[in-house]
Amino acid sequence: MSNDSTEGTVGSCNATGLTDEKVKAYLSLHPQVLDEFVSESVSAETVEKWLKRKTNKAKDEPSPKEVSRYQDTNMQGVVYELNSYIEQRLDTGGDNHLLLYELSSIIRIATKADGFALYFLGECNNSLCVFIPPGMKEGQPRLIPAGPITQGTTISAYVAKSRKTLLVEDILGDERFPRGTGLESGTRIQSVLCLPIVTAIGDLIGILELYRHWGKEAFCLSHQEVATANLAWASVAIHQVQVCRGLAKQTELNDFLLDVSKTYFDNIVAIDSLLEHIMIYAKNLVNADRCALFQVDHKNKELYSDLFDIGEEKEGKPIFKKTKEIRFSIEKGIAGQVARTGEVLNIPDAYADPRFNREVDLYTGYTTRNILCMPIVSRGSVIGVVQMVNKISGSAFSKTDENNFKMFAVFCALALHCANMYHRIRHSECIYRVTMEKLSYHSICTSEEWQGLMRFNLPARICRDIELFHFDIGPFENMWPGIFVYMIHRSCGTSCFELEKLCRFIMSVKKNYRRVPYHNWKHAVTVAHCMYAILQNNNGLFTDLERKGLLIACLCHDLDHRGFSNSYLQKFDHPLAALYSTSTMEQHHFSQTVSILQLEGHNIFSTLSSSEYEQVLEIIRKAIIATDLALYFGNRKQLEEMYQTGSLNLHNQSHRDRVIGLMMTACDLCSVTKLWPVTKLTANDIYAEFWAEGDEMKKLGIQPIPMMDRDKRDEVPQGQLGFYNAVAIPCYTTLTQILPPTEPLLKACRDNLNQWEKVIRGEETAMWISGPGPAPSKSTPEKLNVKVED
């Protein structure tokens, strides 16, 4: 080779950062590379020259120069030469066992030892295994069992137990170690230097055993210092890089959790996909061949699963197959024990463990070698078990795998909890749909009912009496649907609704009123009649949409009323109170109204434009909500102030809404404006409901207010007096001020107030209050069809 070419080669090496020292250091750590290079690339003649040169030196002794390089207890020079190599090895996931073996080779040179043995902890950290490096051409590193960690056996076991360095000049004469080193060449060994390899946080990871043969000088304290310094440096270096690995793994885990969270919230229905995502990461986390996730059925004391890792891959990702669900007793197997005890189990040999349940292997055709089984705990209870099967790199799962998996198991609990919660929600939705289907069937009128209403004819006498404010629908129960059709046609015109849809709607509304004493179908038609009378006596004041909306709102304003007040539902956390925090029943009534409108053939507003449809629904909503008596007091006060100051303007929508709200209250309370016998009978119905609510409160140990206490029925007249003065009279007074044609309501209310005062005084009240209009006719009534033209 010419000088020019030689210079070019050296320059190239320098450019890449290689130095003679780094190459030598690498070859010291990798003697097999040198062996292969020599055997393949160096001629026999050259080897002979090397051998002749070598015979001039002691064959078993390292050169003084080589020894001195590693005898500095601060590892000056060696650290700098090997640091980048070691970090590179560790950063790329290099085998710590092999790396420590290579470093042990350096320590052997530094201490002039004849040989060494490197031990690592066994599967359960209670035994030692001697490390056998790979062969020159092929083969994998091996760990050969060397016995349990206990005193009274070998020096390595003794040091592992005590975690203290031992320097023994003559091991064969030391009674503490009856088995000596336990190595095959132990009879030639005399002096032993045995050191524990401990991490920076105090965990024992291995034992280095250096020895010298018979006839050699025994190890001394300086050798111990050199070896200790080397191991300390190596332990710190490895720990530092492992910490970095751990941080990288934590970052990876955090990224994974964010990814899974995004997956879950973006596609909440794909629970199987979420579980697959988790199981894939869990496999990679501990380098397992298979993964299984079992959920716990505490009711039946079983474990079950329907998602299985079949060991195949597609585009580099494991395939999970959803099959028929398998179940087995919680009393069986390793997974069963983990589910029962909540303890982590790390089984190095599954078939040697009597707890292993072979049924799953028989079912799947898979052979299980080792298992890492972790409980998934939520709210102090085991809700699932994650089982990692067959460690890929290594003979079994390690303690590090356990620690990493414990951290991951916390998120598994969250994911599994979400999965179970979603499953329950889906199950509840199915029950809900079935229930709604049944409810729909039983709450929709029959064809006979709505067709009968279409053919119904209303007596002429009733048509005349309907126009009166104090008209009582009570005696005409079979005619109530027809009465409402008549009022709709009189107020809004016969073509305002399709007759078939209107009849369907009315009869289904009737069916959805419950059989409670007061808030029932009769009350609905009574309130609708009062609104009809107000609209008829204030003709031209309200739009067509308002007239339609208000009459429908009155008919539906107490739909599905259960006979209990809002305060009762809220006090005892009724589901309706959870749905509607304010105006609970009123919001439910509106919701039921919309539900009926959405039934097939029931949408009486289907001919309206979309904007008109929204308007009429809003009119109905506001009107029904206004029947919440808690809202009445503030509304009436505002209207009274507007009226007194002259600021009330019915062209202002907010003012108009307030007036309509007062009209709804007046209609809802209209029983106080009927003839006295009707008013008194209706009061009995109202109190029947109040007392039923009071009885329920008493059952729960709560004393109801006097109005709801049947034991205080003697206080009813006094209570009515207070109600009239505080609520009814002010309501009709303000309404009369704004809408003067409604004055008959105020007059009738005052007459009934006088009747209650007479009751309190003990006077006879068995009389009818005279009212406008003709007396009921005793003649045979003329028949009129409900479809009356204006």
Curated annotation (Swiss-Prot):
Its EC number is 3.1.4.17. GO terms for biological process: cAMP catabolic process; cGMP catabolic process; regulation of adenylate cyclase-activating G protein-coupled receptor signaling pathway; regulation of cAMP/PKA signal transduction; signal transduction. A divalent metal cation 2 binds at residue 558. Signal peptide: none annotated. GO terms for molecular function: 3',5'-cGMP-stimulated cyclic-nucleotide phosphodiesterase activity; 3',5'-cyclic-AMP phosphodiesterase activity; 3',5'-cyclic-GMP phosphodiesterase activity; 3',5'-cyclic-nucleotide phosphodiesterase activity; cAMP binding; cGMP binding; metal ion binding. Changing residue 101 to C: Decreased protein abundance; decreased 3',5'-cyclic-nucleotide phosphodiesterase activity. Detected in striatum (at protein level). Detected in testis and brain. Residues 768-790 are annotated as: Disordered. It is found in: Cytoplasm, Cytosol. A divalent metal cation 1 binds at residues 523, 557-558, 668. It catalyses: a nucleoside 3',5'-cyclic phosphate + H2O = a nucleoside 5'-phosphate + H(+); 3',5'-cyclic AMP + H2O = AMP + H(+); 3',5'-cyclic GMP + H2O = GMP + H(+). Residues 780-790 have a biased composition (Basic and acidic residues). Induction: Down-regulated by the expression of a huntingtin (HD) gene with an expanded polyglutamine repeat prior to the onset of neurological symptoms related to Huntington disease. 3',5'-cyclic AMP binds at residues 290-291, 334-335, 368, 387, 519, 720. Pathway: Purine metabolism; 3',5'-cyclic AMP degradation; AMP from 3',5'-cyclic AMP: step 1/1; Purine metabolism; 3',5'-cyclic GMP degradation; GMP from 3',5'-cyclic GMP: step 1/1. PANTHER family: CYCLIC NUCLEOTIDE PHOSPHODIESTERASE (PTHR11347). The tandem GAF domains bind cAMP, and regulate enzyme activity. The binding of cAMP stimulates enzyme activity. Belongs to the cyclic nucleotide phosphodiesterase family. This is cAMP and cAMP-inhibited cGMP 3',5'-cyclic phosphodiesterase 10A.
